[in-house]
A protein has these predicted regions:
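Contiguous beta-strand segments within globular domains
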Residues: 130-140, 233-239
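Compositionally biased low-complexity segments at domain edges in trafficked proteins
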Residues: 214-240
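Short Pro-Gly-centered beta-turn/loop motif in secreted/extracellular proteins
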Residues: 173-196
């Protein structure tokens, strides 16, 4: 896979373009018209690896507050049974792969519906967050249960509002999230109101140990500040 990727990086002039919304394109079309976004890159890599008999799939996150977009990439199964992520024109092949984007949750696309996918985005997406981050359990201690509510959603910040990326469930009157990216990422509990998502509690920040700190505003002791940037300049953008 590493040799194939290096060959493609030298000979396959893929033109990144996310201005258009394509259906899934065939391998022959992508070979002749090397254009599209990360999904088209991923599809082309999947076509190639499957012709070589290498087990391969597509992983994705729904939305990153760092990059302001969703993203997908290919993962192939190595001889140890582990799935190794790789991106066609961006990264090499490494078990220590890290594209440094905030992900929140990671999902794997399946070709057939899964009965117990555990995903709120449909039966063809399976939650594989633990392939990228250690298993954890985050408790939102400040969240108040509404009636007999069994579960709710958690989202991340976007310029157009909060975007759901996962869910929490109620266990012994505690709101619990299973397996999310922790450390420096702000999440927002959400519920549906009409046709839009609205906050159902205070946003919270997690530390590296998975402890959640709710960001509750102090309405008594106030300060006046000038806001010049709504979102921090992350290391991902600095490196670019």
């Amino acid at each position: 896979v590493d040799s194939l990727q290096h060959y493609l990086q030298r000979t396959y002039p893929f033109c990144y373009n996310n201005d258009f919304q394509y259906p899934h394109l065939g391998g022959e079309f992508l070979l002749q018209h090397a254009v599209g976004a990360c999904r088209e890159e991923t599809d082309f890599m999947i076509y190639l690896l499957r012709t070589m008999g290498i087990p391969v799939a597509s992983d994705r996150y729904i939305y990153s507050p760092d990059a302001f977009l969703g993203h997908s990439w290919s993962v192939f199964k190595d001889t140890t049974g582990s799935f190794i992520p790789t991106e066609l024109l961006r990264t090499g092949v490494s078990r220590e792969w890290n594209n440094r984007r905030r992900k929140g949750k990671v999902y794997r696309e399946q070709t057939i519906p899964q009965k117990n996918s555990g995903s709120l985005f449909g039966s063809k997406l399976t939650d594989v967050t633990t392939d990228y981050y250690p298993t954890n359990q985050v408790v939102i201690s400040s969240l108040q249960r509404k009636g007999k509510e069994k579960e709710g959603l958690v989202g991340v910040f976007s310029m157009n509002g909060w975007v759901p990326v996962g869910k929490y469930i109620w266990q012994n009157n505690r709101a619990v999230i299973e397996n999310i990216e922790v450390g420096g990422l702000i999440y927002q509990p959400l519920r549906m109101n009409g046709n839009r998502w609205i906050p159902s509690g205070y946003p919270f920040l997690t530390d590296e140990e998975g402890r959640a700190t709710s960001l509750i505003p102090d309405t008594i002791h106030t300060e006046t500040v000038t806001l010049t940037r709504k979102h921090p300049l992350t290391q991902y953008w600095v490196d670019i």
